[in-house]
């Protein structure tokens, strides 16, 4: 997927984040800043990365984001609760206002995040939502042509792209 996104003219930063097991907001959100995210950035976040993309967009302008395996609650999990993403209410209007577009990909057979979570996020963001039935938690590392096509379509709608 990285190569496919680069072929769209994107400078792809695919880096393991610090604290990648606990995925704490207090570490990840400043790291997104360190990577140089700005109004021309497309954030693509999977699982905890999707939560980070949401929280980042509450207070920062980005071009757009793609959220894969997203949720809005800690799912009753102590580790998720400790991550810091779920302490404050979600500022859906700010997330939406701070970017031109948002796409969500989820699978109804995700063993970690119930599909109702992603549907809830999509309903609050009034964004593009794509629901699969057989992708689990999208951890198979296979190509993801649907995501690449979505980004391609969105970039084509941005003036000057």
Regions inferred by a protein language model and the residue ranges of each:
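Catalytic histidine-centered segment of alpha/beta-hydrolase-like enzymes
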Residues: 23, 135-148
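Active-site catalytic motif of lipid deacylating hydrolases and related acyltransferases
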Residues: 1-39
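Short beta-strand/loop motif that positions the catalytic acidic residue
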Residues: 98-99, 103-106, 110
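Catalytic histidine neighborhood in serine/cysteine hydrolases
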Residues: 11-13, 122-138
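Conserved alpha/beta-hydrolase "acid-adjacent" motif
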Residues: 111-117
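Gly/Ala-rich beta-loop-alpha elbow adjacent to hydrolase catalytic centers
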Residues: 44-54
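Active-site nucleophile loop of the alpha/beta-hydrolase fold
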Residues: 17-20, 66-75
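Conserved alpha/beta-hydrolase fold motif
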Residues: 43-44, 104
């Amino acid at each position: 997927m990285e190569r496919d996104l680069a072929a769209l003219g994107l400078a792809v930063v695919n880096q393991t984040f610090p604290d990648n097991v606990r995925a704490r907001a207090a570490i990840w959100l400043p790291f997104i800043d360190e990577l140089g995210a700005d109004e021309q950035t497309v954030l693509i976040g999977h699982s905890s990365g999707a939560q980070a993309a949401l929280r980042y967009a509450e207070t920062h302008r980005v071009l757009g984001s793609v959220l894969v395996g997203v949720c809005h609650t800690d799912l009753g999990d102590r580790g998720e609760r400790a991550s810091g993403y779920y302490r404050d209410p979600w500022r859906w209007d700010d997330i939406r206002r701070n970017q031109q577009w948002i796409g969500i990909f989820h699978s109804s057979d995700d063993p970690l995040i119930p599909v109702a979570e992603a549907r809830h996020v999509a309903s609050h963001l009034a964004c593009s939502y794509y629901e699969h039935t057989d992708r689990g938690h999208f951890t198979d590392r296979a190509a993801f042509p649907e995501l690449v096509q979505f980004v391609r379509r969105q970039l084509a709608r941005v003036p000057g792209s």
